[in-house]
């Protein structure tokens, strides 16, 4: 599984493993790295770094809600995360999509200062049409 990373979310929330144990288990299973979910709240960054070292894998990316990205950037940089994906946002119109794009652009500039790239994880709602374009096109 040399080049395959695991999204920690894949373990689910009721698997009986703590957040740190999920990281260790991913390494034990042979994954090359992990994508974090925001279950790290309240866990000191050094504890996560230690779990990653024990597992022998990096935290390549993280899924972080739009409202938490800015505050989490310093923490994620400490962990060595290079990519942050906003997993979804509520928008139903072209205007709301443009507002999301502005937010993501602002966060992208801030994230760059930490060596992190921001992305957006789309779902089906982004393919609704407003003003003749898919909502996702307005975000892009």
Features from the language model and the residues they span:
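N-terminal pre-domain/capping segments
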Residues: 1-83
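Active-site acidic/histidine proton-transfer and metal-coordination neighborhood
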Residues: 17, 60-140
């Amino acid at each position: 599984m040399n080049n395959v990373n695991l999204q920690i979310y894949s373990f689910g929330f009721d698997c009986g493993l703590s957040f740190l144990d999920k990281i260790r288990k991913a390494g034990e299973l042979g994954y090359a790295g992990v994508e974090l979910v925001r279950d790290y709240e309240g866990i000191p960054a050094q504890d996560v770094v230690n779990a990653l070292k024990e597992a022998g894998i990096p935290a390549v990316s993280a899924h972080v809600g739009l409202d938490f990205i800015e505050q989490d950037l310093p923490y994620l940089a400490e962990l060595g995360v290079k990519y942050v994906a906003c997993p979804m946002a509520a928008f139903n119109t072209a205007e709301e999509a443009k507002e999301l794009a502005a937010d993501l652009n602002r966060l992208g500039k801030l994230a760059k200062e930490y060596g992190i790239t921001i992305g957006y994880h789309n779902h089906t709602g982004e393919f609704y049409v407003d003003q003749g374009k898919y909502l996702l096109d307005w975000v892009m």
